[in-house]
Amino acid sequence: MGRRKKIVQECETLMDDPEHIRNIAIAAHVDHGKTTLTDNLLAGAGMISDDTAGEQLAMDTEEDEQERGITIDAANVSMTHEYEDQNHLINLIDTPGHVDFGGDVTRAMRAVDGALVVVDAVEGAMPQTETVLRQALREGVKPTLFINKVDRLISELQEGPEEMQKRLLAVIQDVNDLIRGMTEEMDDIEDWTVSVEEGTVGFGSALYKWGVSMPSMQRTGMDFGEIMELERADNRQELHERTPLSDVVLDMVCEHFPNPVDAQPMRVPRIWRGDAESQLADDMRLVNEDGEVVLMVTDIGVDPHAGEIAAGRVFSGTLEKGQELYVSGTAGKNRIQSVGIYMGGEREEVDRVPAGNIAAVTGLKDAIAGSTVSSEEMTPFESIEHISEPVITKSVEAQNMDDLPKLIETLQQVAKEDPTIQVEINEDTGEHLISGQGELHLEVIGQRIERNQGIPINTGEPIVVYREAPQEDSREVEGRSPNNHNRFYISIEPLGEDIVETIKMGEASMDMPELERREALQEAGMDKDDSQNIEHIHGTNILLDETKGIQHLNETMELVIEGLEEALDDGPLASEPVQGSLIRLHDARLHEDAIHRGPAQVIPAVREAVHNSLIDASIKLLEPIQQVRIDVPNDHMGAASGEIQGRRGRVDDMYQEGDLMVVEGVAPVDEMIGFSSDIRSATEGRASWNTENAGFQVLADNLQPDKISEIRERKGMKQELNPAIDYF
């Protein structure tokens, strides 16, 4: 029997023993060594050759991943590991570290119970380290730490034992500060900081395949002094043989990460708001493989032979071929064609996948990343909140008109596979817009359409996504219907930043119980009476109904909300989305005859009232900004900081780290287009840098008129603004 077949059989045997299952993700900042580490674990489990581990990058299965040397998609694999005489099944997801692909990390965290955070010993905790930790902790996923590239401290930087200890302790301290800061208000999480003594921190070199932790040193009798001697003498093979990385890391996974039986009672209440007393809630908490089927889809991929594959976590019940299951948000049922598990880029079909495991399913044609799939209709899981929103848009056109239907189908598939991509399809003009997390994100999507689907495309210049927001309180404004029989009286004011953040993070939404929503918003600073009058939340905008006993308003409210959403999706300045508004409906006059207060009357009246209130509230254009970090040799520091300042940016900090200077600052996304080639030439290719989306800020007053005019022209809108907009 082939080795692979044997592993699949071992996995199938262990699937029914949730106490010996570990569902884990490996996450880190870009280039800190996640995928190389994953290769080591696969080699340790006998799934790839030990000789090529670290070079094979077995989880980077896409051609563009191997070309760019970065992980773009999250890849899944199941393997086995013996720990304390007991075989364990480890379902592992290797995630991307580049900020543009953070959506994959967010979705992976929903499927797992533990996150192995990898940090480069030389660079330390970086911006994306903080982001992946936040994503893990928000989902109730327990972290452990592996400090990689320790060989560089010994061989390259020639650090002595004291220097090295100081540096490693500083990395641990930084990670623990982040964990403490993020969990202090989470009542259900005890102390999840990591520690060398407890064995939740490992050190080593994924490239040279050795690793150590406190338990492994006690077991092998090796200490750091001996490791430094072997590393300096270039005896890395002996190091690998005496303290193999895969054993150290997988032992840590088995010992310190919770199994599904321990994890699900804590995680289910965080991600599911259904009836906590129901049988279904019990089945999920107890990982009952005989209960109703509940699958949370975290990823959609396409196999050229099998079609669409939905990957996700089975929280309850057992998945089997032929089952007919409900998919949240769609009517009818989907029939399962096959179930399987992942072995790197390959899917292995199995007969069944019980609760507590990560499964690969075909046949769920209506599922998207984030769907809840179940054998009985149920309250779906909380939607997966992505930490970043799209900030760059590109137009995409097929070079040949004959390819248009195929391109539209491909773009719809892209949006299904990656919910952080927004696709706008215009069948009339043939020009379609895709919005994503950054230039690289959209570049990769464009290349995959051409390479995988064989559709030659033209893409436009990157366009930055703007927002509009009120800056002060408006007066009460009247909106009239075209027939003059209906009137709405509305005022608008800016929402507090904490309230906007609470909505963004999914901690307050219309899907949750009213009392919970009220409490969350009051905690964020909302007035108690206001929190009780909420009628609707759209994006990060809240509608309050402050009317008293108005006839026919109840049956008209749906149209009011429709008019409100239309007005907020296309702001009055440049038809960009409005954010952070508190809209008060004070009063309404409605015609008693329903025929005179239909959609054609109510929607324009509300839209007019909302737009005029926003104008009265000094609405301004907001632009997206990015945090920028540049690591550069001392003599190029001036050039690096000049690159930020020359882009309307601001340098917030400069400090020495090892032999490099670090420049940190903030710059507008619009000015960061083309940054990579400019920073390379300014620093003679000596700089490494990282950008991370940091929300939106008000565009400077002197730039507002030109930018509004430019956007309106691009959208084919007339240049004249509403005459009330006179504050420029």
Curated annotation (Swiss-Prot):
Keyword rRNA-binding: no
Any one of the GO CC terms: cytosol
Species of origin: Haloarcula marismortui (strain ATCC 43049 / DSM 3752 / JCM 8966 / VKM B-1809) (Halobacterium marismortui)
Protein name: Elongation factor 2
Gene name linked to the record: fusA
Chief place of localization: cytoplasm
Keyword GTP-binding: yes
Keyword vocabulary terms for this entry: Cytoplasm, Elongation factor, GTP-binding, Nucleotide-binding, Protein biosynthesis
SMART domains registered for this protein in UniProt: EFG_C (SM00838), EFG_IV (SM00889)
Classification of source organism: Archaea, Methanobacteriati, Methanobacteriota, Stenosarchaea group, Halobacteria
